């Protein structure tokens, strides 16, 4: 079940209080900064259809070309977003194997992005992948998370994996496995954030100015 609306997160909380919160134990969500398409309920995340649902941080540069291809294949689009294009492309290539589908889509899309993906056929799993946009996997006790940065999860866990380029994480309630695009499992070091909550918001730096200075090379890239 999808619940979304434009504006502040409080608007979504109010909407769910009025309509009833979805029942379940796996979910994805995203606070969207509008790049393709105006801020609106329909352009808000998640996007997808009955088989695939995604959230997306970043920009898909060749979304127009991919959208034209998908329209030619009979797909229609409700939003103006590049995210919906990625969702429909996943649906187009989906053959029952999420890993193969994600790898194929990664070979097609260009840009910098982080994706959180759910497949209807795999209701207990979240798939996550990144290219040039940050993405971490938080490891908790009988709960796991994906987020763009540590401050989003530090109230729930301090343990996390840093995903590298084109690595695919498969997240379940009690397990996290990470693979390359060829399906080979990767064993990564588990990191632990030893900062307090205030420091976490500064990324481990003493103050925000230092954080911004050290982030400038990545911003320029």
Residue ranges and their predicted role:
Residues 1-221:
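Conserved short alpha-helical segments that host acidic/polar catalytic motifs at enzyme active sites
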């Amino acid at each position: 079940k999808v619940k979304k609306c434009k504006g502040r997160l409080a608007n979504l909380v109010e909407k769910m209080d009025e309509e009833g919160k979805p029942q379940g134990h796996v979910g994805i969500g995203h606070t969207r900064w509008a790049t393709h398409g105006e801020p609106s309920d329909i352009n808000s995340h998640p996007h997808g259809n009955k088989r695939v649902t995604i959230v997306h941080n970043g920009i898909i540069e060749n979304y127009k070309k991919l959208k034209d291809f998908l329209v030619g294949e009979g797909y229609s689009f409700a939003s103006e977003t590049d995210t919906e294009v990625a969702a429909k492309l996943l649906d187009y290539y989906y053959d029952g194997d999420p890993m193969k589908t994600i790898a194929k889509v990664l070979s097609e899309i260009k840009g910098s992005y982080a994706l959180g993906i759910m497949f209807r056929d795999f209701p207990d799993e979240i798939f996550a992948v990144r290219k040039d946009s940050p993405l971490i996997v938080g490891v908790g006790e009988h709960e796991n998370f994906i987020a763009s940065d540590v401050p989003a999860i530090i109230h729930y866990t301090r343990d996390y994996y840093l995903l590298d380029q084109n690595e695919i994480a498969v997240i379940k309630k009690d397990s996290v496995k990470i693979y390359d695009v060829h399906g080979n499992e990767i064993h990564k070091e588990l990191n632990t954030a030893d900062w307090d909550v205030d420091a976490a918001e500064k990324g481990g730096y003493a103050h925000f100015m230092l954080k911004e200075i050290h982030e400038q090379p990545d911003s320029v890239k």
